[in-house]
Amino acid sequence: MEKPVPGNPNGHGCGHNLLGAGALGAAIVIKEYLKATGKSGTVIFYGCPGEEGGAAKAFFARENEWAKLDAALTWHPDDVNQVVTGSSMACIQKEYIFSGVASHAAGAPEQGRSALDAAELMNIGVQFLREHMGKNASVHYAFTDAGGVSPNVVQSKAKVLYMIREATVQDAVKLEARVDKIAQGAALMTETQLSTRFIDGTANPLPLKTMEQLLYKNFVQVALPEYTEEEWAYAAALKNTYESAGLPSYAAKFDENIAQTVDKATDGGKRALNDFLMPMYHSSVTLPGSTDVGDVSWQTPTGQINCATAPSMVPGHSWQMVSAGTTGIAHKGMLTAAKVLAAAAIDIID
């Protein structure tokens, strides 16, 4: 089951290969409804590339595109059927670029100014910063250029990409400023030059209970997928390839009554597929992770659902999610999303 597929087939570690098609399906249904009834209304299908890190919706927001709308609806593949509630982290992506002087690491080390040392010192400084960050803050990094592959060279260039998250945009910007100072200090210590490249930023979503209730009402009315024996068997086999503990859905983590309901429906989390609708739940809790849907919500009322496209409690950004993303399970979840979004949009129009 875990093996590379030749070529460049469809698939994504977070199910994003299903996102656009599900939303497009909803747009087509709404269009046909307007044509059939003669009612007036405008439905716009937005293609938003780079949602995994390019934050296209934030660039739309910069141009005030979402402010033109009466409402915005979207969905995200998941292992459960539920209405999304609460918020998530504001996030800033930024690359720190250090430039130094190359030299022979043994023959003339004193002539070198190591950009790699600067990047590593920056990372160490950020580790010490963690103790003094807010409880909602998190910082992640990855080397995008470590300078080279020869250890006997003082590396003259290094790049490290940071994701800086906080509960609000304002707090994320403040944390970014502290990370900037650490980078500046690392450059000062190593006598290297620092430059930065802002990549993108996303805002924390604004939860809207009224929109959540509208989506849930329509979710209840849409028939959820029925799976074949083969799909159940596939899901069970895939579920056996990863560790899973606890119960699916964040609602079960915060609400004891919902936890009891989910525990019963999933046989204590052992069930391979979540073929039911999670109970209605509204929260203002800030969850980990980030989404550019947040930028939309600051300009127009926004609602989002999750639909089951993979086995229960499948880890995100995993080969298991990729594998599930081209199956009938995923396609059924995608079509469910189209139906729920279309029905909710029609209610808004009416």
What label would you give each PLM region?
Residues 1-13, 99-103, 276-280, 318-327:
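Glycine/charged-rich beta-loop-alpha catalytic/anionic-binding loops adjacent to active sites
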Residues 2-11, 17-18, 34-155, 165:
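Histidine/acidic-residue-rich, glycine-tolerant segments that coordinate divalent metal ions
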Residues 13-30:
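Active-site alpha-helical elements of protease catalytic centers
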Residues 22-25, 52, 288:
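Short secondary-structure boundary/capping elements
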Residues 25, 55-59, 110, 174, ...:
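Generic recognition of short, well-ordered alpha-helical segments
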Residues 116, 120-350:
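Metal-dependent amide/peptide-bond hydrolase catalytic core
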